[in-house]
A protein has these predicted regions:
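Flexible hinge/capping segments at coil-to-helix
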Residues: 49-60, 64-86
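Short loop/turn segments at beta->alpha junctions
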Residues: 22, 77, 116-117, 135
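Ligand-binding cleft/hinge of the Venus flytrap
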Residues: 3-12, 80, 95-109
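Central regulatory/effector-binding core of bacterial HTH transcription factors
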Residues: 1-46, 115
């Protein structure tokens, strides 16, 4: 977002359209030409795209109310999740992302629902009716929030990639974004 924000400040005529969705939805929009870029937090083949991997990875964890007894733990184990009413990422469930992580506890996982975007799911957690398995930094867990995040242990992480179609002539604004994004990633190297 920093690179995009800088471009908007430097070029007042550049306009953006931010769309949220899961990886499948974003890939479809990219293929149909509805969007120029997609940010994917998923381990999947990127052979059909140009892509840049962002240096940071996203860590999975559990969102709960701050007054929940699990909030006292530094990390959440598979055993901690057994029999809890869980809301899981629809995409992660479809891709069997957690099968090896929770191992033989699979039958003890009480998945009461799935979500494609985290906002509505966190409302259920705030009501105390569910726990949310999601990435860190996707919910508001500031001091005034009643929610908190605890990472899963052992750690389960995902890479983040910015992707765009191959063999497509990009607009000048899109070319500028790619150039600046590459330059910003070089500072991490």
């Amino acid at each position: 977002m920093r690179v995009l924000s800088e471009i908007i400040k430097d070029y007042s005529d550049v306009k953006v359209r931010l769309i949220s969705g899961n990886a499948d939805e974003m890939e479809t929009a990219l293929q149909h030409g509805s969007i120029d870029f997609a940010v994917l937090m998923a381990n999947r083949s990127l052979d059909n795209y140009h892509h840049l991997q962002i240096p940071e990875s996203d860590r999975w964890g559990l969102v709960m109310r701050k007054d929940d007894s699990l909030a006292n733990k530094a990390e959440i184990s598979p055993e901690d999740l057994a029999d809890l009413p869980l809301l899981m990422s629809e995409q992660a469930i479809e891709e069997h992302r957690f099968q090896s992580w929770w191992g033989n506890l699979d039958r003890k996982m009480n998945i009461i629902g799935t979500y494609s975007l985290v906002f509505n799911a966190q409302l259920m957690v705030a009501q105390g009716s569910a726990y949310l398995v999601t990435f860190d930094h996707l919910i508001n867990n500031a001091n005034n929030s009643q929610l908190t995040f605890r990472p899963l242990a052992p750690a389960l992480t995902e890479t983040t990639n910015v992707i765009w179609k191959k063999n497509v002539t990009q607009s000048k604004a899109a070319q500028l974004f790619i150039k600046r994004l590459m330059a910003s990633l070089d500072t991490y190297a």
